[in-house]
């Protein structure tokens, strides 16, 4: 869909050792207790892996539900930074690398679970986080959660979906699966799978309770960013209640996945694609 060119923030967050010393992750019980609880000045501490330091570090990001009150076609620097924090949290923690080869729940999603809890998102679902990192499928790890609230007297549901772009082991090999044509098979395959997962999540949530106005908050870095662009372009077609003005997508260091002639169902125009200075971009380049 649209690549949010915000590498300045990426450099700030992913630079190793410059933000905070490594520390132990909070216990699951403590994270759960924080759901929906405001913190002073609306700055929340989110965790991320630092490959350079070989440790899990943390950084404070501003978040408020009011970030989604304006149309997605308006660039928001604070929302871009918050998305960066969530995209980094979607990566597998450094500590989980000790169980690199194991299947199942081994802590690969601890950072993003903690981040969702702190920001008040519930009903977390994880996709492709339980594979051994020795596996090489054309998939992408994604964590999804939702937050239903009242804004301006109307019910609103924010769907948060953040794609893993680092610490994903042999899943990286999908970056090299370019395929015989100009559409990148490794990205397109992962995107089509994820579109169905997110659609199913939204439909199931809607059966539990009315969602009101649906808003999507999505982000990803590197491979995760490339796939997020494609997913976000497709979702409004399979979720008619999701309007473009409510599709908030920021990606970082996202590779190009298609040419203009490829996969029309994964294409989108770029009149809400902005550079880091807020200027409008006219193409994905």
Please describe what each predicted stretch is:
Residues 5-28:
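N-terminal export signals
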Residues 21-43:
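C-terminal segment of N-terminal export signals and the immediately downstream linker at the start
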Residues 42-49, 53, 63, 69, ...:
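Terminal low-complexity/disordered tails
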Residues 49, 54-71, 98-114, 272-278:
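Surface-exposed intrinsically disordered loops and tails
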Residues 110-219, 234-251, 264, 268-278:
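A conserved cap/lid and substrate-binding interface adjacent to the catalytic center
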Residues 220, 224, 228:
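Gly/Ala-rich beta-loop-alpha elbow adjacent to hydrolase catalytic centers
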Residues 229-233:
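Short, hydrophobic alpha-helix immediately C-terminal to the catalytic nucleophile
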Residues 251-257:
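Active-site nucleophile loop of the alpha/beta-hydrolase fold
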């Amino acid at each position: 869909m649209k690549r949010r060119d915000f590498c300045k923030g990426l450099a700030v967050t992913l630079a190793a050792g410059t933000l905070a010393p490594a520390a132990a992750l909070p216990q699951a019980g403590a994270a759960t207790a924080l759901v929906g609880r405001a913190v002073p000045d609306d700055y929340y501490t989110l965790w991320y892996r630092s490959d350079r330091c070989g440790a899990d570090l943390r950084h404070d990001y501003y978040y408020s539900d009011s970030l989604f009150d304006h149309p997605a076609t308006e660039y928001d620097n604070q929302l871009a930074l918050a998305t960066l924090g969530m995209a980094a949290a979607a990566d597998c923690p450094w500590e989980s690398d000790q169980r690199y080869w194991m299947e199942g729940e081994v802590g690969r999603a601890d950072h993003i679970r903690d981040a969702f809890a702190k920001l008040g998102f519930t009903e977390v679902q994880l996709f492709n986080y339980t594979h051994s990192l020795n596996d090489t499928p054309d998939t992408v790890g994604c964590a999804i959660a939702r937050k239903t609230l009242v804004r301006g007297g109307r019910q609103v549901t924010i769907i948060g979906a953040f794609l893993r772009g680092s610490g994903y082991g042999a899943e990286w090999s999908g970056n090299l699966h370019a395929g015989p044509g100009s559409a990148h098979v490794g990205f397109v395959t992962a995107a089509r799978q994820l579109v169905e997962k997110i659609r199913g999540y939204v439909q199931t949530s809607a059966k539990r309770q009315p969602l009101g106005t649906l808003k999507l908050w999505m982000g990803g870095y590197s491979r995760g960013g490339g796939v997020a662009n494609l997913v976000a372009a497709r979702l409004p077609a399979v979720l008619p209640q999701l309007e473009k003005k409510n599709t908030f997508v920021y990606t970082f260091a996202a590779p190009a996945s298609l040419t203009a002639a490829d996969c029309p169902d994964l294409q989108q125009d770029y009149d809400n694609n902005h550079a880091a200075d807020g200027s409008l971009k006219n193409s994905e380049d």
